[in-house]
């Protein structure tokens, strides 16, 4: 509990909060050339580059990522989850928030099974995360 003299020196300061996915919190109105703060769960974009990256120290792999120019004009790096993909330059993708722990600078994931992105083939468990359809039952 603060004393009166402590409160007289200055009131309590609210903690400032910074978004972990800033590109999803901005909307661009091209008609009026204005930027608005409006958060969205997903954003559509066009791939400008598809490449691989090596993860941070204890891990070793070639992780796939894409540079995506979003519909609000911001360009971000997005991780391509799952094994194998069909993405190339000019592919239209949908991105969601969520960083990859061992890839610095990647704060977004590409949603598999939407737009030009196909789902992961032969995926039987955790299918919804990778856009895979339910396998046909064999008799």
From Swiss-Prot:
<keyword id="KW-0488">Methylation</keyword>
<comment type="similarity">
    <text>Belongs to the universal ribosomal protein uS12 family.</text>
</comment>
<dbReference type="Pfam" id="PF00164">
    <property type="entry name" value="Ribosom_S12_S23"/>
</dbReference>
<keyword id="KW-0699">rRNA-binding</keyword>
<comment type="function">
    <text>Interacts with and stabilizes bases of the 16S rRNA that are involved in tRNA selection in the A site and with the mRNA backbone. Located at the interface of the 30S and 50S subunits, it traverses the body of the 30S subunit contacting proteins on the other side and probably holding the rRNA structure together. The combined cluster of proteins S8, S12 and S17 appears to hold together the shoulder and platform of the 30S subunit.</text>
</comment>
<dbReference type="GO" id="GO:0015935">
    <property type="term" value="C:small ribosomal subunit"/>
</dbReference>
<dbReference type="InterPro" id="IPR012340">
    <property type="entry name" value="NA-bd_OB-fold"/>
</dbReference>
<keyword id="KW-0694">RNA-binding</keyword>
<dbReference type="GO" id="GO:0006412">
    <property type="term" value="P:translation"/>
</dbReference>
<feature type="modified residue" description="3-methylthioaspartic acid">
    <location>
        <position position="102"/>
    </location>
</feature>
<dbReference type="GO" id="GO:0003735">
    <property type="term" value="F:structural constituent of ribosome"/>
</dbReference>
<feature type="compositionally biased region" description="Basic residues">
    <location>
        <begin position="124"/>
        <end position="139"/>
    </location>
</feature>
<protein>
    <recommendedName>
        <fullName>Small ribosomal subunit protein uS12</fullName>
    </recommendedName>
</protein>
<dbReference type="InterPro" id="IPR005679">
    <property type="entry name" value="Ribosomal_uS12_bac"/>
</dbReference>
<comment type="function">
    <text>With S4 and S5 plays an important role in translational accuracy.</text>
</comment>
<dbReference type="InterPro" id="IPR006032">
    <property type="entry name" value="Ribosomal_uS12"/>
</dbReference>
<feature type="region of interest" description="Disordered">
    <location>
        <begin position="116"/>
        <end position="139"/>
    </location>
</feature>
<dbReference type="GO" id="GO:0019843">
    <property type="term" value="F:rRNA binding"/>
</dbReference>
<keyword id="KW-0689">Ribosomal protein</keyword>
<keyword id="KW-0687">Ribonucleoprotein</keyword>
<comment type="subunit">
    <text>Part of the 30S ribosomal subunit. Contacts proteins S8 and S17. May interact with IF1 in the 30S initiation complex.</text>
</comment>
<keyword id="KW-0820">tRNA-binding</keyword>
<dbReference type="GO" id="GO:0000049">
    <property type="term" value="F:tRNA binding"/>
</dbReference>
């Amino acid at each position: 509990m603060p004393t009166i003299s402590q409160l007289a020196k200055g009131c309590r300061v609210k903690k400032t909060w910074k978004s972990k996915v800033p590109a999803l919190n901005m909307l661009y109105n091209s008609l009026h050339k204005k930027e608005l703060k409006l958060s969205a769960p997903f954003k559509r974009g066009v791939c400008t580059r598809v490449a691989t990256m090596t993860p941070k120290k204890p891990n070793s792999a070639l992780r796939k990522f894409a540079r995506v120019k979003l519909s609000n004009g911001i360009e971000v790096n997005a991780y391509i989850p799952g094994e194998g993909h069909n993405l190339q330059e000019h592919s239209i993708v949908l991105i969601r928030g969520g960083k990859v722990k061992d890839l610095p600078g990647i704060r977004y994931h590409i949603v598999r099974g939407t737009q030009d992105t196909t789902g992961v083939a032969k995926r039987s468990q955790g299918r919804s995360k990778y856009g895979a359809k339910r396998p046909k039952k064999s008799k």
